[in-house]
Amino acid sequence: PQGAVLSTGKIDRTRCTTCGNCAEACPTAALVVQGYSVTEEMLFQRVTKEKVFYRDGGGVTFSGGECLLQSEFCAKVLRRLKHAGINTAVDTCGMVERKDLEAVVPFTDTFLYDLKAIDPKVHKRCTGAENEQILENLTYLNKEGANVEVVIPLVKGYNLGEWKKMLVFLKNLERIRTVKLLKYHGFYFSKYEALGWEIPAT
């Protein structure tokens, strides 16, 4: 309806409003909407059905995208999971408002915190965003005594020169106990192709 689906079969993402009408109208089902809406109760019931698998340290991880962009919803479900005795984790890049973290801290056993760069220019070049809020939120979690596992993806040509700076920064956060360096992988290639994006050279 917005002219986002072109005659070539490609999609102009700048025109897409994510209404889903094109997928509904597609006669061959070549266009599909990924994902669906759930209520707090629906998600809680679905997750607790699997409770038997959460023994011996297993649990539920909220991730995304950025799950804390829906922090109020996450907090409600996390609270119920904690009361049900299920271990909880939140995977975040930290690019959220402080109130979003504050909402989930009491109900989160572990934070998986992505850290991509210390130098703000490098971070902006890699992600398109500044990192001041990310570093401030990580410092906040440290002060709160949260259990944080820092995850650092290393990509040649992007942030490989940042890893020492990141470790120096983390050394000053005395409660951070775990840091994982992740080697670059191509798991996201299929997502880029589905979106019609060019896969960056590495």
Locations of the language-model features?
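Inter-heme linker and motif-flanking segments adjacent to c-type heme-binding CXXCH motifs
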Residues: 4-7, 31-34, 53, 73
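Short glycine/proline- and charge-enriched loop/turn segments
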Residues: 193-201
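Conserved AdoMet/S-adenosylmethionine-binding subsite of the radical SAM
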Residues: 41-194
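Poly-acidic low-complexity segments
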Residues: 6-7, 11-12, 50, 119
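A signal for specific C-terminal beta-sheet/loop modules enriched in small/flexible residues
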Residues: 7, 23-24, 53, 141
